[in-house]
Amino acid sequence: MESGQPDLVSPTFSSISLTMSAQSDHLAIFMTATDTGVGKTTITAALVLALQKKGYRVGVMKPVETGLDPQQPETSDTGRLQSLLSPPPAFASICLYAFPQPIAPLACARAHGITIDVAGIATAFHIVRQQHSVCFVEGAGGVLTPLSPTHTIRDLIVSLNLPAIVVSRTSLGSVNHLLLTLEALHGAGITPCGIVLNDPLPSTQNECFIRQRTSTIGLIQEWSTVPVFGPLEYQKTVQTDWRRGMENLANHPEIHRLANHLIENEP
């Protein structure tokens, strides 16, 4: 692996010990979403910064990432999360499987003739967890995204024995997507500990859109038995200055409310 660039495809554990520690009492949360491109990394990053400001030593994992440019790893989700930590850990300790193709993890793994090892991810997670007072694990896509012929993201959450935060859009159709996601989590015995409503794209401020968004938010709050945070409006700064955008989002009252909720009601 040259110049700190990630070793695409092949997992490497060279930067961490593979001696399993005892189960940690430290706070750990799985970050999932109703879909891809909803803003998991954005919300994870904001929570990392918010909790760091409260004095917590925060760790992150993005065990599987697809669509990663090996020439610009710093622009990947993993690279951006890595940049928030001090000192920055090795890329490979955050992301065990990095694929260049922007397709589903199982399709990527098959294209490269490998199998994503959920048990191996769990081993790496427990080590990272022991080193931090708070740890976030970010998934890929939604909860039923296949990782291997036998395991989905949901199976990974079960294997890690973590509660989950679900990031959802506020656009039309999100009520159905979110309720299906919650049903899938509950069906596997996974505890959803929060819903974050996020606008990952600029909004069209016409009357129809505003009505759709307002009604979607209202119905999610009405139908959810899980605490709802947000909505978080699209952050234009994120596209031009990612770090500054994340600092701004970390100061958002709803991110603070979510961070406090996690600390005070440790799942």
Feature-to-residue mapping (PLM):
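N-terminal phosphate/diphosphate-binding loop that engages ATP/GTP or pyrophosphate donors
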Residues: 42-115
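Phosphate-binding/switch loop-helix module in NTP-utilizing enzymes
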Residues: 105-147
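C-terminal lobe/tail of nucleotide-utilizing enzymes
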Residues: 183-267
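Short internal beta-strands
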Residues: 62, 165-168, 193-199
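Conserved glycine(s) of the Walker
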Residues: 38-39
